[in-house]
């Protein structure tokens, strides 16, 4: 199975289109989104082509292909409009004898690792 991994769209229709173009080009089976889907947060500038309603429509059209974890800018109001789960703090995928631990990065990251074995993989965004 081929996964396309992305993070931190922050409501940018421009980057969401780029994501979906890459998804089609790479012929990926699934998308793993590492949070911060719709909102940019009060500390951040508006992203390029900030249009969360467009992002909602584009991603909901692919809801069956998306696995997502919650970012620090994601909330229950976002879950009300997205038709795929976004509220998990992390997900764990089996990979051979190890795991892939996917999270947003605001709790666990290189400086604060989750419990991992040698050979396990940590994926995070929070860019």
What residue spans do the PLM features occupy?
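Conserved beta-sheet core of the metallophosphoesterase superfamily
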Residues: 84-88, 96-99, 106-127
